[in-house]
Amino acid sequence: MADRIELRGLTVHGRHGVYDHERVAGQRFVIDVTVWIDLAEAANSDDLADTYDYVRLASRAAEIVAGPPRKLIETVGAEIADHVMDDQRVHAVEVAVHKPQAPIPQTFDDVAVVIRRSRRGGRGWVVPAGGAV
């Protein structure tokens, strides 16, 4: 499946982390989501109902990030991915949760986890490099 919808750089304040100060003060998280879905019907019909609504995707992802604190960003990414996979039209999803202000003492640009889900292989199935599903 080559068709996909990409949401990049969704920035949301959340309270996720292992340390108490992360869960109290919170910090900025950046979310990237790629949804593999057949877009042929949407292209032919020109109807929002025939595609995956990226406005709703952004809204739900933001709700999850801003929601209850989690110790691990892996959990946050999995919640977003599982929500996307609730839509049976979706073939696969990849969610990257970036934590650019993570409490790492060394200088770094970013740290992220990437969660992938697919109908073909279920949880943890790896989408091949280049995104072909």
Curated annotation (Swiss-Prot):
It catalyses: 7,8-dihydroneopterin = 6-hydroxymethyl-7,8-dihydropterin + glycolaldehyde; 7,8-dihydroneopterin = 7,8-dihydromonapterin; 7,8-dihydroneopterin + O2 = 7,8-dihydroxanthopterin + glycolaldehyde + formate + H(+). GO terms for biological process: folic acid biosynthetic process; tetrahydrofolate biosynthetic process. It is found in: Encapsulin nanocompartment. Pathway: Cofactor biosynthesis; tetrahydrofolate biosynthesis; 2-amino-4-hydroxy-6-hydroxymethyl-7,8-dihydropteridine diphosphate from 7,8-dihydroneopterin triphosphate: step 3/4. SMART domains: FolB (SM00905). Its EC number is 4.1.2.25, 5.1.99.8, 1.13.11.81. One of its GO terms (cellular component) is cytoplasm. Keywords: Encapsulin nanocompartment, Folate biosynthesis, Isomerase, Lyase, Oxidoreductase. GO terms for molecular function: dihydroneopterin aldolase activity; isomerase activity; oxidoreductase activity. Pfam families: FolB. InterPro entries: Dihydroneopterin_aldolase, FolB_dom, GTP-CH-I_C/QueF. CDD domains: DHNA_DHNTPE. Substrate binds at E22, Y54, I73, E74. Residues 119-133 are annotated as: Targeting peptide. The active site is at K99. The C-terminus (residues 119-133) targets the protein to the encapsulin nanocompartment. NCBIfam families: folB (TIGR00525), folB_dom (TIGR00526). Homotetramer in the absence of substrate. Homooctamer in the presence of substrate. Belongs to the DHNA family. Possible cargo protein of a type 1 encapsulin nanocompartment involved in protection against oxidative stress. Catalyzes the conversion of 7,8-dihydroneopterin to 6-hydroxymethyl-7,8-dihydropterin, 7,8-dihydromonapterin and 7,8-dihydroxanthopterin, respectively, in equal quantities. After longer incubation times the only product is 6-hydroxymethyl-7,8-dihydropterin. Retains aldolase activity when encapsulated with a slight decrease in rate. It is not known if this protein is normally found in the encapsulin nanocompartment. Was identified as a high-confidence drug target. Cloning (to improve crystallization) removed residues 121-133 which corresponds to the target-loading peptide for the encapsulin nanocompartment. Target peptide removal does not change enzyme activity. This is Dihydroneopterin aldolase. It comes from Mycobacterium tuberculosis (strain ATCC 25618 / H37Rv). The lineage of its organism: Bacteria, Bacillati, Actinomycetota, Actinomycetes, Mycobacteriales. The gene is folB.
